[in-house]
Amino acid sequence: MLLFVGLGNPGAKYSRNRHNIGFMAVDEISRRHRFSPWRRRFQGETSEGTLDSERVILLKPTTYMNESGRAVQEAASFFKLGVGDVTVFQDELELAPGKLRVKVGGGIAGHNGLRSISAHLGNDYRRVRLGIGHPGVKELVHGHVLSDFAKSEMPWVEALCEAVADNAELLTGKRDSTFANKVHLALQAKGFLDKGDAGAA
């Protein structure tokens, strides 16, 4: 069994925020793979299903971003999962819009959701980093992540979430590089990334 966590803030006010792209990604996994309806538990919402014969629990913490670790720890404890069974889908300022990286462990780069999860679980969980781009200067970061994607950005956001969902089965087998390559190739095919953008996980 694996736990896939999408990070974001709860409520309609935040639903299209850049900070909520993790929620958007797991919503699309649930839709594409016909997981169970979302239900409230573990200080969040869960949807359950199977990817490549592996049972997967999707979790969207409703604690707000800064306390995400409480929900993740509660779910992981209930299912007796280790930190290596947890994958977190997060927004990433340091990646260009539409780009993706997969990494196990590492720093939190100022991300409050990751800080909370690391405080509760330790650091050795997998992160699927979904690029939202950087506003250019540090002072604009807070407003950038908590503002909505522009209407003109939604095509690449939707394409990224769809590609993540279409290839999510690869994550159950730890085929992280293949997953990242396939996602980037899907975005290239739709004209959202240049040919040189694929290949790195």
Swiss-Prot record:
Q: Where in the cell is it found?
A: Cytoplasm
Q: Which reaction does it catalyse?
A: an N-acyl-L-alpha-aminoacyl-tRNA + H2O = an N-acyl-L-amino acid + a tRNA + H(+)
Q: Which Pfam families match?
A: Pept_tRNA_hydro
Per its UniProt record, what InterPro entries does this chain match?
Pept_tRNA_hydro, Pept_tRNA_hydro_CS, Pept_tRNA_hydro_sf
| UniProt binding sites for tRNA | Y14, Y64, N66, N112
Q: Which GO terms describe its biological process?
A: protein quality control for misfolded or incompletely synthesized proteins; rescue of stalled ribosome
The entry's active site is H19
Q: State if 4Fe-4S is listed as a keyword.
A: no
**Which residues of this protein are annotated with the site description Stabilizes the basic form of H active site to accept a proton?**
D91
Q: What is its EC number?
A: 3.1.1.29
Primary location class: cytoplasm
Site note Discriminates between blocked and unblocked aminoacyl-tRNA applies to N9
Q: Which CDD domains does the UniProt entry name for this protein?
A: PTH
How does this chain assemble?
Monomer.
From the Swiss-Prot or TrEMBL record, give the protein name.
Peptidyl-tRNA hydrolase
Per the UniProt record, the source organism is Bradyrhizobium sp. (strain ORS 278)
